[in-house]
Amino acid sequence: MKVLLTGGAGYIGSHTAVELMNAGCDVVIADDLSNSCREVVKRIEELGKKTVRFYEIDVCSEDALEQVFSENDIDAVIHFAGKKAVGESVAKPLIYYKNNLDATMNLLEVMQRHDVNKLIFSSSATVYGVPKVVPIDEKQPTWCTNPYGWTKYMSEQIMRDVCAANPKLSIVLLRYFNPIGAHESGRIGEDPKGIPNNLMPYISQVAIGRREKLSVFGNDYDTHDGTGVRDYIH
């Protein structure tokens, strides 16, 4: 099976690529490297012990996507590509709506032209907003609280509508929270460009010496467990 990974050089995409290769799949990656680098692709090939066909493209370009599908006999797609910083989405909502929704619609259109009918979409638990009940299950109501979450929810709805119109199409929507960790080899992991959007990259960067220290802000909640009470409860 030949699988296209959009955003496949990113944190989750790179680990997915390695696992697919280990399972015997051929992998094609389309990534604009806005939050990764070419070295990651080399490491994917090293860990997967196979060659990856890599396209440095913006998935928002329908012509570029058309080239990928024309040059490869794609069996299935996993769609990771998209902007993903909640805070940035609040400051720059139009950029997020245009980028993430254009990418989704372009991908679906090109898939239909090439009769590719299997898609896994990397959605997000942000579609649940602030849940009234935890733990969350799939039956919880959705109500997003930021533009990033809305782009994920809108992409899901577009996919539902396309599925309703095309019975051959099979789409899985994955709503997950932020993962942490790295490949056991240490060769790939979360290494964002610019300022990290969550805690774990800061910890990793301190561990490897890229940052001098991990800053903890505030000193007026001296609790035994620290994070759990100080940062969440208070």
Please annotate each region the language model reported.
Residues 1-182:
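N-terminal Rossmann-like NAD(P)+-binding domain of SDR-like oxidoreductases, especially those catalyzing
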Residues 160-233:
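NAD(P)-dependent short-chain dehydrogenase/reductase
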